[in-house]
Every structure is written in C-alpha cells, then in structure tokens.
From Swiss-Prot:
Belongs to the G-protein coupled receptor 1 family. Opsin subfamily. Zn(2+) binds at E201, Q279. Residues 62-73, 134-152, 225-252, 309-348 are cytoplasmic. It is found in: Membrane; Cell projection, Cilium, Photoreceptor outer segment. The chain crosses the membrane at residues 37-61, 74-96, 111-133, 153-173, 203-224, 253-274, 287-308. Glycans are attached at N2, N15. It comes from the Eukaryota. Disulfide bonds join C110-C187. This is Rhodopsin. One of its GO terms (cellular component) is photoreceptor disc membrane.
Length: 348
C-alpha cells in the first residue's frame, strides 16, 4: 500500500520512514510545504468573502420583494440555502484547519464538516434536478395543462432534502465514514479504502449511482429535450419573434448550466472514482486536494448562474442595494413584460 491507514484516517503517504502522524493530532507538513496550506486557507477565505454575501443577498432580496416569492424561485432559494450550508458548515472549518496544517477538530469535527459539506453539495445538486424537471414539464408539456404551483415547489424542496440526507447521513451511522482527504484539512467520504467494517464499498457504489450518475442523466435529458422542443417550435414559426428570443435564452442557460456543473464536479468525481477503483495506487495529497477544493467554487457559480441571470431578480437586487432606486432605469412594466414573454422557456 502506498498510503498509511489509521483507525479513522487514510494519509496518501507511505509510512516506510515513520514520519506519518495522525491528521487529527499533528501538522501534516510532510505532505506539503507550509505555504501550500496557507494558500488553501487564503482560497477558502476568498470563497467565504464571495460566497456568503451573494447567497445571503439572494435570500434578503427575496424577502424584501414579495413578487419574487414565486414557486419556481423557492427552488432557486434552496440553492442559496445549500450554498450557505457549505460556507458555514464547511468553508469556515476548512479555513481554520488549513491555517493549522491539520484537522484540529478531531474525528467528531471531521464528521460534522464532512456532513455539512456533503449535505450542502447534495441539496444544490438535487435542486438543479428539480429545476431541470420543472423546466422540462413546463416547456415540453408532457402533461397537458400542467401548472407548476406552490405545492409542487414545496414537494420539490422536501425531495431535495430527503435525497441530500440519504447521501450525507449514512456515514454518521455506520455505513461508510468521513475522513480527512488530500492534504488532510477537509473531510469527505472515504474513497480510499474498502473498510468492510462499515461496508464502505457498497456505499461508494450507491453514492456514485444514485447521487451522481442519475442526477447527471436527468439534467442532460431534461435540458436536451427542452432545447429540442424550442428549436422545433421555432422551425414551425410558432410565435416567431418570441420563440426566437426564447431559443437563444434557453440555449445559453442550458450551455452554462451543463458546463458549470461539469466544471465543478466532474474533476472531483473523476478523481474519487479513480482512487476508489485503484485501491493502493500511488498518488500524492495534491491529487485529491485540487479537485476537492475546486468543487467548492459551486457556492459562487450557483447564485451567479441560476439567480443573477434572472432579469426580475436582478432589477430587485439593484433596487435593494441602491436604497429603493434603480439607476439603470428598468421600470416595473418592462421587467414584468420581459418575465411574461419568456416565462415558458427561460428561467423565471
């Protein structure tokens, strides 16, 4: 084995020379230089500084403007809540541990950090799935006369939390476990060992199939059908001007959604899958650290893509920030008209 396994950790460094120490008790400076740990801390500080205000602003603006409290926006707000979970439950902890060079909060703290980070990420992922299904049902109309209402939105929210907990909670109760990963300053699911005592292999397979591949398939399917439907409507010259404009907006949103999702999560999932399927292979701590920390940028991408591109929300946000005035001069009528014009195909 090219790593060192302990009772509740796996360090990707051979202990042939006897230098490996528990990541819960000693700085891990034999894995990387101290300045590299400082860089991780600076990176986490940047994510906190950017991620907290933009996600908090999303919630605040929605509370201030009643017209934003629509069923579809409930799902979008769920993304902001998920990102705040990641910021407070994961990023702040990782910032502190990176400054110390090891996971100073012990196994219990590792469980909590891993749980909140996983929970936030999964809430966001399943929120995107619900959003994709809603767009598919509204635009493609597989069910005639369907209207996405408040009850559907609430059911969608409950679904995202159930699925997120179904992924994040099992390691806390004995099915798999959370351990420090990479440079040992943040915690995640144990992809490194089979650990039969906690049935780790079955959980990782379950997690990849149910909580990664299936959501990815649903997102691709729904938005693929959505683009096809819009193109077909445009080709038939149905409401030509409106449809042509909607086609551009939907295509742009689909491309950004898919690319952002893949950029954020495929590197992490790919490395995790490689580590899991190549038990005992030789890899360094940076190999998992970079994709794990890069995936955390989703807390910034989500509000920018799914909230900031909403014309009505953007107008309300500017009005809130400018103490009730909109220096851009977008009046209520034009905003409402724009929303109505593309309500069937563009983000609400």
């Amino acid at each position: 084995m090219n790593g060192t396994e302990g009772p509740n950790f796996y360090v990707p460094f051979s202990n042939a020379t006897g230098v490996v120490r528990s990541p819960f008790e000693y700085p891990q400076y034999y894995l990387a230089e101290p300045w590299q740990f400082s860089m991780l801390a600076a990176y986490m500080f940047m994510l906190i500084v950017l991620g907290f205000p933009i996600n908090f602003l999303t919630l605040y603006v929605t509370v201030q403007h009643k017209k934003l409290r629509t069923p579809l926006n409930y799902i979008l707000l769920n993304l902001a809540v998920a990102d705040l979970f990641m910021v407070f439950g994961g990023f702040t902890t990782t910032l502190y541990t990176s400054l110390h060079g090891y996971f100073v909060f012990g196994p219990t703290g590792c469980n909590l950090e891993g749980f909140f980070a996983t929970l936030g990420g999964e809430i966001a992922l399943w929120s995107l799935v619900v959003l994709a299904i809603e767009r598919y049902v509204v635009v493609c109309k597989p069910m005639s006369n369907f209207r996405f209402g408040e009850n559907h939105a609430i059911m969608g929210l409950v679904f995202t939390w159930i699925m997120a907990l179904a992924c994040a909670a099992p390691p806390l109760v004995g099915w798999s476990r959370y351990i420090p990963e990479g440079m040992q300053c943040s915690c995640g699911i144990d992809y490194y060992t089979l650990k039969p005592e906690v049935n780790n292999e079955s959980f990782v397979i379950y997690m990849f199939v149910v909580h990664f591949f299936i959501p990815l398939f649903v997102i691709f399917f729904c938005y693929g059908q959505l683009v096809f439907t819009v193109k077909e409507a445009a080709a038939q010259q149905q409401e030509s001007a409106t449809t042509q404009k909607a086609e551009k907006e939907v295509t742009r949103m689909v491309i950004i959604m898919v690319i952002a999702f893949l950029i954020c999560w495929l590197p992490y999932a790919g490395v995790a899958f490689y580590i899991f399927t190549h038990q005992g292979s030789n890899f360094g701590p940076i190999f998992m650290t970079l994709p794990a920390f890069f995936a955390k940028t989703a807390s910034i991408y989500n509000p920018v893509i799914y909230i900031m591109m909403n014309k009505q929300f953007r107008t309300c946000m500017i009005t809130t920030l400018c103490c009730g005035k909109n220096p851009l001069g977008d009046d209520e009528a034009s905003t409402t008209a724009s929303k109505t014009e593309t309500s069937q195909v563009a983000p609400a």
